[in-house]
């Protein structure tokens, strides 16, 4: 199965998600947050740096729980602002 290329909007949304997760993580280590979320630190690193801009829903949900974020907050903070 061939994966279709990501759109610029999907890449931007992934970058916003990564930035939000980095901010929410603060001084806590990637390994600590990844462990609580049940994912690898490498997966978290890829999401935070935009190398995995479209993570699975349950991965995002687990990270939200580990970081004390609501899914609503993630949606609002990662939503694209329409061009004027």
Region roles according to the model:
Residues 27-29, 55-58:
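Residue-level signal for the short linker/turn that defines the boundary of a DNA-recognition helix
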Residues 1-4, 75-84:
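Short, charged recognition helix plus adjacent turn
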Residues 40-43, 56, 70:
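Short coil turns linking two alpha-helices in DNA-binding domains
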Residues 51-56, 82-83:
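Short, solvent-exposed alpha-helical "recognition" segments
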Residues 22, 31-32, 61:
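Residues within the helices of the helix-turn-helix
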Residues 26-47:
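Short alpha-helical DNA-recognition segment
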Residues 1-27, 72:
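A short, Lys/Arg-rich alpha-helix, primarily the initiator
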Residues 58-73:
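DNA major-groove recognition helix of helix-turn-helix/homeodomain DNA-binding modules
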């Amino acid at each position: 199965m061939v994966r279709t290329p990501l759109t610029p909007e999907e890449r931007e949304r992934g970058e916003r998600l990564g930035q939000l997760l980095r901010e929410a993580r603060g001084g806590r280590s990637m390994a600590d947050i990844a462990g609580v979320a049940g994912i690898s630190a490498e997966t978290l690193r890829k999401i935070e740096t935009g190398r995995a801009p479209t993570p699975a829903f349950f991965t995002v949900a687990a990270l939200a729980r580990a970081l004390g974020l609501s899914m609503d907050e993630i949606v609002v903070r990662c939503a694209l602002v329409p061009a004027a």
